[in-house]
């Protein structure tokens, strides 16, 4: 099962996250990804705040896939946001 694509909410400068939504059987799931995670995924550190939505668009497929996987792996609830950080993409093997 996969979450469905929702909408981009925008960049929150104070929290340094890009907020977006996903849908689980029509129910809106709030999601966010840290700017550090996007920078790590893209291998860049020079992205300005006004470029964050464009950066998200370039990385959207991998971000949404990981948000969906995290939602179901952690049996997340619709009333809690799914927040992605660098360690959600780059885990060290055990």
Tell where the protein language model's regions lie, with residue ranges.
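Short, exposed beta-strand "edge-strand" segments with a Pro/Gly-rich flavor and a Y/T-containing core
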Residues: 5-7, 25-33, 76-84
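A short, structured beta-strand/loop element
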Residues: 19-42
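A broad, structure-centric signal for solvent-exposed, well-ordered loop/edge residues
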Residues: 8-10, 15, 29, 40, ...
């Amino acid at each position: 099962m996969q979450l469905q694509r929702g909408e981009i909410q925008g960049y929150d400068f104070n929290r340094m996250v890009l907020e977006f939504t996903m849908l689980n059987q029509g129910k809106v799931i709030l999601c966010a990804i840290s700017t550090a995670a996007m920078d790590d995924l893209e291998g860049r550190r020079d992205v300005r705040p006004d470029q964050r939505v464009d950066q998200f668009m370039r990385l959207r497929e991998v971000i949404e896939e990981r948000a969906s996987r995290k939602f179901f792996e952690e049996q997340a609830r619709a009333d809690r946001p799914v927040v992605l950080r660098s360690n959600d993409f780059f885990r060290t093997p055990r």
